[in-house]
Amino acid sequence: MIFNNTKENDYKIYLRGDLVMKKLMTGNEAIARGAYEAGVKYASAYPGTPSTEILENIALYKDDIVAEWAPNEKVALESAAGGAFAGARTLASMKHVGLNVAADPLFTVAYTGINGGFVVITADEPGMHSSQNEQDNRNYAKSAKVPLLEPSTSQEAKDMMKMAYEISENFNTLVIMRLTTRLCHSKGLVECEDRNEVGIKPYEKVVKRVTVPANARLLRVDVEEREKKLYKFSNETEVNYMEINEGAKVGVISSGMCFNFAKEVFNNNASYLKLGFTNPMPDEKIKEFASKVEKIYIVEENDKFIEEHVKS
């Protein structure tokens, strides 16, 4: 492997003789790049550390994406949801406490489904570097019964953005992408690809999106059926994977940035179950991993989200 820095943040990397262009990006920059490559048409956000730079970087792709600051997080989510209903790929971005403000439309859109792909990005704050609390927004995904993705690196952040839109459209649901401060602001090499120009889907008037009680009761059945399909996907997806080290008796289950922390501490002295898709949890994969080790440690920040599920 040979590195050749051509200009600031741009690297030519020769892997086995092949030239690969990579950029040094923060997690927030990588999220913006992933949105661009996924064919996102509209993005709305309310600023707040550690999420602010996401929309700032999306705005750099102004020829392809309409980027707007919203007066609050609820408006950001509703604006992006409207774009998704109209058939475009959209996103809404906010810090963790902002999802409290946006909770009303979040739970309703979880029932109605979407048309174009829709991703909601929440940037959580373990350690409260610039926040008033340490709430864990993984709980929102579980309560709303929507898919949850947790990248561990800038490269994963970019790649999972593209994956999130496929999940959103295939399962007719919004997707929550959960970041944390250390991922948002740390840097890593990211391989950039061309934009996938996804067309706007035709709009059709769908009466069920008017969530009066008569419709909402029927939609609840759809939500439960969708969760069964997502559970199957969780056990099959490649972002939930095992790293088995021969002779290791200890197993570590982790997600997000904590996976990097765990690997730095345990190195090859443990085997790992790395969870990138954490709602619904991959029960079958967890059981398989548990059968391969004698003791399990769960490494996560804030709430005992993974731990409580594994114990249950």
Roles of regions detected by a PLM:
Residues 3-7, 11-28, 151-312:
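Flexible, low-complexity linker and terminal segments
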Residues 13-154, 182, 245-246, 269-272, ...:
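Thiamine diphosphate
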